């Protein structure tokens, strides 16, 4: 069951890819240099046609160039028997000279004695990222542009909003830094509860992994996400769909 819990936390990483489009809407990001605005968004998690739970994403500006970004996953119905606790991720970051710089990152599955918790600290003066990941020590060199799994969404949003197609990002994933590649697969018209919408589809993956994430972003809605999928070995195991979006 604990491995299932960890997979569900990993799903949170899939969910936050949706945030790139939500942020674009929240910031009215015609200009990639414009700072993102606060928002709260709710997504349904679909598993083989069943709504297995919901994810809430919340971005809060805490200072002139500082932000806190949170993801909370909660199972519903019979799925709560397997995943009774809230699975959360929190990133704090700043935007300095047009660059997103993560400061701290924390993830846990809601259990006080969890061995799956991740806590990271980014020191941009010493150029090191330190902390613990699943009870293993982390001490890695911090190269320019390195992101955590939440802060990368803001950087990706700025790339897409500027009209550029991002090719890859370096992410710290637990106790390793990995390169994730991004591919613009084309455009597609989708029939949605909001009507027929033209979308841009992106694929995200990395070398050596059979996990693929796809996003459908509605350009006419400021890159609002209307569909996302996570696939393993070519089979879709989770889908996501936005339900609510609130802004101050």
Task: Report the location of each language-model feature.
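Hydrophobic, well-structured mid-protein blocks that either form specific transmembrane helices
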Residues: 113-154
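Bacterial N-terminal signal peptides
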Residues: 12-24
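Acidic, serine/threonine-rich low-complexity disordered tracts
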Residues: 30-124, 159-248
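N-terminal secretory signal peptides that target proteins for export/translocation
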Residues: 1-10
